[in-house]
From Swiss-Prot:
The organism's place on the tree of life at top rank: Eukaryota
Reaction(s) this enzyme catalyzes, per UniProt: (S)-4-amino-5-oxopentanoate + tRNA(Glu) + NADP(+) = L-glutamyl-tRNA(Glu) + NADPH + H(+)
Tissues of expression: Strongly expressed in photosynthetic tissues. Detected in all tissues tested.
Organism encoding this protein: Arabidopsis thaliana (Mouse-ear cress)
Domain notes: The N-terminus (65-92) is required for heme inhibition, but not for activity.
Protein name: Glutamyl-tRNA reductase 1, chloroplastic
Molecular function terms, GO-annotated: glutamyl-tRNA reductase activity; NADP binding
One example of a Gene Ontology biological process annotation: heme biosynthetic process
Swiss-Prot/TrEMBL induction comment: Circadian-regulation. Up-regulated by light.
Top-rank EC class of the record's enzyme: oxidoreductase
Length: 543
């Protein structure tokens, strides 16, 4: 049986067909003859096949291969093969939103830093993910506390497998190790998770505001990127709305600390109380995190800080914004010299390799006696800026983002109460988002119903014009054309009204979906919709 040209140049579709034995070569007469016939000439798969994972989850039936069907087999298109096969679930059923992630709650920083994807690489990652056989859309949320991949998957099981293997390939971490630390969430659970993340409920520091800015950045970077499609972009845009609403309508952000402020608190906890103000402070990196560290040091009474950065421009801007603290700029090549004169060194750069190693630190002079001669490195970067080997130096103490749990463990009861306030909003917004996704299902039917009516209109108009002859003037032609369009639009008005729904009312949505299925059956639109999905998949694969 020849495969339709619709599949040519679409490896993803060909892979689906071949993987699930849907290619012509897979349907040999010998395999058919070995399968016993059931009632009414229906061929039932053997019992041991009924429990097979993947596509065959329920007993499936195949029509017996009669001589008539065999003679007609060559005329069946590839589309009809797919519609009558197990692969139909990939195109007829709604795809799933899936989260494959590792966070500070499930994986150590040593693993997260290997998985981290710089923001500049997000578009490339989205393109690679959408090139996988069972992935339609994708987004990456990579921060110091989490590495999460959001996808729209044709198949949950196979999509997760492909993404996990991709993560292993890009990070060098074995699949088995990733599986030990990853978490998987599907559809409603995935929706609730990103809403909780955006609201600051899943952060190490409850209610911290930086994560909302990071979610916004996912949308900003994703705009115009093939693969950051309607479902995933809609999910993240709704998550931004949730994050704003939670912070506006609850007091979750009141008194909340950020990762940077927690880092300052941790450093002060480790210093003798008498030296909290006099300790010499150095901040490596003048980005958002570094700026917040300086801000919180000033709030704690620090009057002087040395800031090491690649350029002086950002440091000057911070100096103007914070006149209450003396900020001394030093270039990056003086980093070790600055560290040798500091008691506490905060690191917050985007460097993908450590800035401080054991050989850099072991020859530095001891910190001042006021802090016990110990130099404290507080590293809030992922990947880490301070190698774990620095902790082997007798006069050095190293802390990373995972150590901030010691700071935020306090006030647990207050954190839980604030989280409960936010959960009410998140539950409400999750329901609205799922309803919006449901309402999207009617869009293909609306398009195909209009196209169906337009084909009939054009065909009948051509018949009418041919009967009227060549001597018809332009005015009459235009009038007849307008008449045909008016009739079609009036005829479609009622069905279209019953197909449009914003998802805000569950009862209305249910009725809308019933109307959609009825119209699909009456006008045979499912085949057209399926063809459109196949075409979209082919185009996505070719990009």
């Amino acid at each position: 049986m020849a495969v339709s040209s619709a599949f040519v140049g679409c490896p993803k579709l060909e892979t689906l067909l071949n993987h699930h034995n849907l290619s012509p070569s897979s349907s040999s007469s010998s395999s058919v003859s070995q399968t016993p016939l059931g009632l009414n000439g229906v061929r039932v798969l053997p019992k041991n096949n009924r429990t097979r994972r993947g596509l065959i989850q329920k007993a499936r039936c195949e029509l017996s291969a009669s001589s008539d069907s065999a003679s007609n087999a060559a005329s069946i298109s590839a589309l009809e093969q797919l519609k009558n096969s197990a692969a139909d679930r990939y195109t007829k059923e709604r795809s799933s939103i899936v989260v494959i992630g590792l966070s500070i709650h499930t994986a150590p920083v040593e693993m997260r830093e290997k998985l981290a994807i710089p923001e500049a690489e997000w578009p490339r990652a989205i393109a690679e993910l959408c090139g996988l056989n069972h992935i339609e859309e994708a987004a990456v949320l990579s921060t110091c506390n989490r590495m999460e991949i959001y996808v729209l998957a044709l198949s949950q099981h196979r999509g997760v497998k492909e993404v996990t293997e991709w993560m292993s390939k890009t990070s060098g971490i074995p699949v088995s190790e990733i599986c030990q630390h990853r978490f998987l969430l599907y559809n409603k659970d995935a929706t609730q998770h990103i809403f909780e993340v955006s609201a600051g409920l899943d952060s190490l520091v409850l209610g911290e505001g930086q994560i909302l800015a990071q979610v916004k950045q996912v949308v900003k970077v994703g705009q115009g990127v093939n693969g950051f499609g309607r479902n995933i972009s809609g999910l993240f845009k709704h998550a931004i709305t949730v994050g704003k609403r939670v912070r506006t309508e609850t007091n979750i952000a009141s008194g909340a600390v950020s990762v940077s402020s927690a880092a300052v608190e941790l450093a002060l906890m480790k210093l003798p109380q008498s030296s909290n103000v006099s300790a010499r402070m150095c901040v490596i990196g003048a980005g958002k995190m570094g700026k917040l560290v300086i801000k919180h040091l000033m709030a704690k009474g620090c009057t002087k800080v040395v800031v090491v950065n690649r350029s002086e421009e950002r440091v000057s801007a911070i100096r103007e914004e914070m006149p209450g603290i003396e900020i001394i700029y030093r270039p990056l090549d003086e980093m070790l010299a600055c560290a040798s004169e500091a008691d506490v060194v905060f690191t917050s750069t985007a460097s993908e390799t450590p800035l401080f190693l054991k050989e850099h630190v072991e020859n530095l002079p001891q910190a001042s006696p006021e802090v016990g001669g110990l130099r404290h490195f507080v590293d809030i970067s992922v990947p880490r800026n301070v190698g774990s080997c620095v902790g082997e130096v007798e006069t050095a103490r190293v802390y990373n983002v995972d150590d901030l749990k010691e700071v935020v463990a306090a006030n647990k009861e207050d954190r839980m109460r604030k989280a409960m306030e936010a959960q009410t909003i998140i539950t409400e917004e999750s329901t609205q988002f799922e309803a919006w996704r449901d309402s999207l299902e009617t869009v293909p039917t609306i398009k195909k119903l209009r196209a169906y009516a337009e084909r009939i209109r054009v065909a009948e108009l051509e018949k009418c014009m041919s009967k009227m002859g060549d001597d018809i003037n332009k005015k009459t032609t235009r009038a007849v054309d307008d008449l045909s369009r008016g009739i079609v639009n009036r005829f479609l008005h009622g069905p279209m009204q019953h197909l449009r729904c914003d998802g805000s009312d569950s009862r209305t949505l249910s009725e809308t979906l019933e109307n959609m299925h009825a119209l699909n059956r009456m006008y045979g639109l499912e085949k057209d919709i399926l063809e459109e999905k196949l075409k979209a998949m082919a185009e996505q694969q070719q990009k």
